[in-house]
Amino acid sequence: MDLLAELQWRGLVNQTTDEDGLRKLLNEERVTLYCGFDPTADSLHIGNLAAILTLRRFQQAGHRPIALVGGATGLIGDPSGKKSERTLNAKETVEAWSARIKEQLGRFLDFEADGNPAKIKNNYDWIGPLDVITFLRDVGKHFSVNYMMAKESVQSRIETGISFTEFSYMMLQAYDFLRLYETEGCRLQIGGSDQWGNITAGLELIRKTKGEARAFGLTIPLVTKADGTKFGKTESGTIWLDKEKTSPYEFYQFWINTDDRDVIRYLKYFTFLSKEEIEALEQELREAPEKRAAQKALAEEVTKLVHGEEALRQAIRISEALFSGDIANLTAAEIEQGFKDVPSFVHEGGDVPLVELLVSAGISPSKRQAREDIQNGAIYVNGERLQDVGAILTAEHRLEGRFTVIRRGKKKYYLIRYA
């Protein structure tokens, strides 16, 4: 199976320009390609992951990827897929975000590969010094307003309005493609399905300035969920690639909770498992869905890819401890990850009666209720059921001297921190 055929089997091709020409080029030459990532936050998120991993797939097939950080375009704002005008971010903010995103992208590509090392570029390097007159003469002259108005990213904003700033975005992205074509021999741009208009604008600029040049575009479909909710969002917010914003445990849990209807598609999109391995998991899903083997494989592969082996091991340990109730063997760092979003209470002082702590931490509404909860076996301390209403929590109940985990009932957890 050639690269394009594999991408199609994985469901990673939404649209291409001249599919036959692109297949021929990929099969005959080492192709330089790029994908752009605008810094709209201080971290990339899992919505960016399909594009990042597609760059990696191209590199593994022998091609040369360029990850382009949009230090300049991030100052402007892409109207694609947006119903209203973006808020402009300060230059210093975008610079800081660009540096963070550059570091994140570096984890997924090989910069030492023999013959096809990856590169990371920042389009501020060439758009920043560009003066208005040069831009209008060398780029703007090649775009008619009629052509730009016909693009979906503009059409969708006709009613609500679009500023000249965002209207000009596609010309800046087109200029990126031309610049990389000239300086790096870049022949292919890939991006999300909402980037089709911007990608074809780049091809148009290359054609008008370079004649019948062979350059191509490929878009990746928008990742969807069978239940209709937005991919990459949970009740607690966006799933980020930065472990400080989304812990490896939360990240692992996101994937392990994948719907049966989505899991095989996600294995194709987000893992490097072979066709045979994925088909075996698909068969197991049909025959024994309760084992959730496909979800476990997905969660393990993607967590390892993004956060590494050790973070994966920690995420699995936390998951198993929470499932079994065996909290006492977790490290303080693992407890902090696993209980990041549960209610927490800071206890100042030494030993404390359990009844008193349950009330002061808001776990039980009154001392009477606290005693009832304890007597009824509803209170667990570090995974151990305590039914002694006279129990005193001492230093022995502090995990690594920092935390006590209290559970009320089957699932309601509370984290006690010690000042």
UniProtKB/Swiss-Prot annotation:
GO terms for molecular function: ATP binding; RNA binding; tyrosine-tRNA ligase activity. Signal peptide: none annotated. ATP binds at K233. It catalyses: tRNA(Tyr) + L-tyrosine + ATP = L-tyrosyl-tRNA(Tyr) + AMP + diphosphate + H(+). Its main location: cytoplasm. Residues 352-419 form the S4 RNA-binding domain. It is found in: Cytoplasm. Disulfide bonds: none annotated. A motif ('KMSKS' region) lies at residues 230-234. Keywords: Aminoacyl-tRNA synthetase, ATP-binding, Cytoplasm, Ligase, Nucleotide-binding, Protein biosynthesis, RNA-binding. L-tyrosine binds at Y34, Y169, Q173. InterPro entries: aa-tRNA-synth_I_CS (IPR001412), aa-tRNA-synth_Ic (IPR002305), Rossmann-like_a/b/a_fold (IPR014729), S4_RNA-bd (IPR002942), S4_RNA-bd_sf (IPR036986), SYY-like_C (IPR054608), Tyr-tRNA-ligase (IPR002307), Tyr-tRNA-ligase_bac-type (IPR024088). Its EC number is 6.1.1.1. A motif ('HIGH' region) lies at residues 39-48. One of its GO terms (biological process) is tyrosyl-tRNA aminoacylation. SUPFAM superfamilies: Alpha-L RNA-binding motif, Nucleotidylyl transferase. It holds the Pfam family SYY_C-terminal. One of its GO terms (cellular component) is cytosol. It is an enzyme of class 6 (ligase). Belongs to the class-I aminoacyl-tRNA synthetase family. TyrS type 1 subfamily. Catalyzes the attachment of tyrosine to tRNA(Tyr) in a two-step reaction: tyrosine is first activated by ATP to form Tyr-AMP and then transferred to the acceptor end of tRNA(Tyr). Homodimer. This is Tyrosine--tRNA ligase.
